[in-house]
Amino acid sequence: GIFYVPILDATKFNTTSGMESLFLHEAIPGHHYQVSLQQENSQLPKFRRFGGNSAYAEGWALYTESLGKELGLYTDPYQYMGALGDEMHRAIRLVVDAGMHSKNMTREEAIKFMMDNEPLSEEGTIAEIERYMAIPAQALSYKIGALKIKEIRERLTKQLGAKFKLSDFHDE
């Protein structure tokens, strides 16, 4: 398939960092690849082939971003710096999502926290915060899912020792 990145204003969008982590997350080995394999797997029941699970889907996509460094896929330091910026964004999401839904953080406090801690536009920040308001814990699902995949990988690495193959783990 083809992966398109719709850039509304190329004069304002930073393509010098973060594009490779975006590709890993959204395309290969991220969502595009994951969903293609999932939908082609006739051994899965239909609710798993065509349904969604945010912790699995977003967890996998976030996990694949970490593979960029591990497998030497980032082509320059700016792309890796962009990946680290994306990781910071995920950490900030954890604070505001959990804060709004369990700690009485207001919409305005969440917007301020996000704008104080990362370089997003006000419009982008408001859109993010309203997304978290509408879909509680969706932002949390990225990190929780990725951590669970890493936990399973570490457990299997210890259990299997020299027999552990990363490609086999990713195939399961």
Q: Which residues are covered by each model-predicted region?
A:
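Long, His/Glu/Asp-enriched segments that create or flank divalent metal/ion-associated functional microenvironments
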Residues: 1-172
